[in-house]
Regions:
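Residues forming the flavin
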Residues: 1-18, 30-526
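ABC transporter nucleotide-binding domain catalytic core, centered on the Walker B motif
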Residues: 23
């Protein structure tokens, strides 16, 4: 566990330091970052214990569970989202230090009620895309989010995103850059540090301002629920020991908190999340020993799997994790027991040990966080819509498009006139974004030998059709075209000048440049 000081993509901020006491011992953290990051950097991964005394650490890492709750200056707070700034003392919650006989006196406070057309719970890509479209349709909205920044999961994403667009906007941009643009310049009506704790009768939403410790209410004609998802953790022996983390924890700590939880990683799950977190771990200075996948084939996008192969990371299909091997004091792990499997059942006699690891990165999917959606549908009826991962787990592209689509649906329920063709177009794009990559070509096209000898050229290792076309915008000569999500990009080698702009703009790192005259090869390396 260490602080990341150099990164090929991210700019490491140089903030001041702040020292606080953890269980009576001084710990120094960086201002503007969480208590969880400070404790891990100081070598304290244990934050709580089970009822029978087992060491516990972070679980979701994004403020959606109570696994990291500790006493922070006498108040129960989640250390994964609580900054170290001005904190004096942090300690584990025990029966001894949390039992109190004091009575809490009720406070007389004026009731604050905000009224709007549409309330949006969640300031992630789906919620903010919905807000933008509602604004274009002439509807007011209030956005409520428990985090201190807008952007949701995009804030943790350093990779470039796939988008199929008619006009270039988000395609090829990195997640944290997209997060900065989603709300535009006008952030009015966005309430951060605010948690929705109930949806009441008469379409009233109860909210707590966690920063100022006060309650307020939002009354709206319609409701959008963009609450995202929570990580799914499979069960295996010692799945609760520190060193076993979900991808959300690994990614949040690495890309948002600049904290590397380990140097030698075993990833479980060969899907897009497994590929991307493994790739980002390598960028941050860790070594990924292997990726396990219980299915007999790889998941995710083939271009993402290929970028992993180019780094030399092996992908073992039909393999599952049986056990995490803890160290002597159970504050970390030293290895894992894996085996071959069939239909998600272990095959006896195939067990083997992968040693020399200090983190298991669990990338086995997400579960929609849809409790508020369920209650919202009871209260608002058809005027309640779910967007993003709250209704269907998908890519960031899908979340943005669903947010836009839902805005039109809510506008229709509120009898607001709009161009229906625009709604149909967005709906088609949303459906297309769910498309699993379909293999179109067997091998990458190449120019004729005569053209190869004339000037530099590129080849596309993009053999599958799916919703992505940033390469077509990257080419200044318009030599790359892609007519739909069901085809692969086509290169006009007569127009291609070999400028290599497309090599660095492909989100899947799937374009390679060649200059046979000078024997040069241009690789997509980040």
């Amino acid at each position: 566990m260490e602080r990341i000081v150099n990164h090929p993509i991210l700019t490491i901020p140089q903030e001041g330091e702040h020292t606080f006491l953890f269980n009576g011992k001084p710990v120094t953290g960086m201002k503007g970052f969480t208590i969880a990051a400070a404790l891990h950097q100081a070598g304290y991964p244990v934050h709580s214990h089970s009822v029978n005394g087992r060491n516990r650490s972070l679980n979701c890492g994004i403020g959606k569970c109570g696994a990291c709750e500790m006493l922070v200056d006498g108040e129960v707070k989640r250390i994964c989202i609580t900054k170290v700034d001005n904190v004096k003392e942090v300690s584990e919650i025990t029966v001894q230090n949390y039992t109190t006989d004091s009575q809490i006196e009720p406070r007389e406070e004026p009731v604050e009620i905000y009224r709007t057309d549409v309330a949006i719970i969640g300031a992630g890509p789906a919620g903010l895309a919905c807000r933008e479209t509602l604004k274009e349709l002439g509807l007011n909205s209030i956005v409520i989010d428990s985090n201190d920044k807008i952007g949701g999961q995009f804030l943790m994403q350093t990779h470039a995103f796939f988008f199929f667009e008619k006009e270039r906007r988000f395609g090829g941009m990195r997640g944290f850059d997209i997060a900065k643009t989603l709300a535009g310049d006008d952030h009015s009506g966005i309430f951060l540090h605010s948690t929705v704790w109930d949806i009441l009768q008469n379409k009233r939403i109860a909210v707590k301002d966690m920063l100022n410790h006060k309650n307020f209410y939002v009354e709206a004609q319609a409701l959008i629920v963009a609450t995202g998802a929570v990580p799914f953790m499979p069960t295996f022996e010692n799945d609760d020991v520190p060193g076993v983390y979900t991808a959300a924890v690994v990614q949040k700590m690495m890309n948002a908190e600049f904290t590397l939880l380990g140097k030698n990683i075993l990833t479980v799950g060969a899907g897009n999340i497994g590929y991307l977190t493994s790739y980002q771990l390598m960028q941050a200075g860790a070594k990924v020993k292997a990726i396990l996948e219980a299915m007999p084939h790889e998941g995710g996008f083939p271009v993402q799997a290929n970028r992993i192969r180019r780094l030399g990371i092996p992908i073992y299909t039909s393999h599952m994790l049986l056990k995490a091997i803890p160290n002597l004091d159970r504050t970390g792990i030293t290895g894992a027991v894996v085996c071959e499997c069939e239909n998600f059942k272990p095959i006896p006699g195939t067990e083997k040990v992968i040693d020399g690891i200090d983190v298991i990165n669990i990338c086995t999917g997400l579960i929609p966080d849809n409790q508020l959606l369920t209650k919202g549908q009871y209260t608002f009826g058809k005027r309640c819509a779910g967007v993003g991962d709250a209704v269907r787990i998908g890519e960031g592209t899908t979340a943005v498009l669903r947010g836009k689509q839902a805005a039109y649906e809510i506008a229709q329920e509120l009898a607001v006139r709009f161009n229906y063709n625009e709604y149909l177009q967005i709906s088609k794009q949303y459906i297309d974004s769910h498309q699993h990559p379909i293999r179109i070509k067997e091998e990458s096209p190449r120019p004729t030998p005569e053209r190869q000898a004339q000037r530099p050229f590129v080849r596309l290792d993009c053999l599958y059709g799916f919703a992505c076309n940033p390469c077509s915008f990257a080419c200044p000569q318009k030599a790359i075209t892609k007519s739909s999500t069901s085809v692969t990009p086509e290169i006009n080698y007569e127009k291609c000048t070999g400028c290599m702009q497309c090599v660095s703009h492909c989100p899947g790192l799937a374009i390679f440049g060649y200059d046979t005259r000078k024997q040069n090869l241009f690789l997509p390396v980040e």
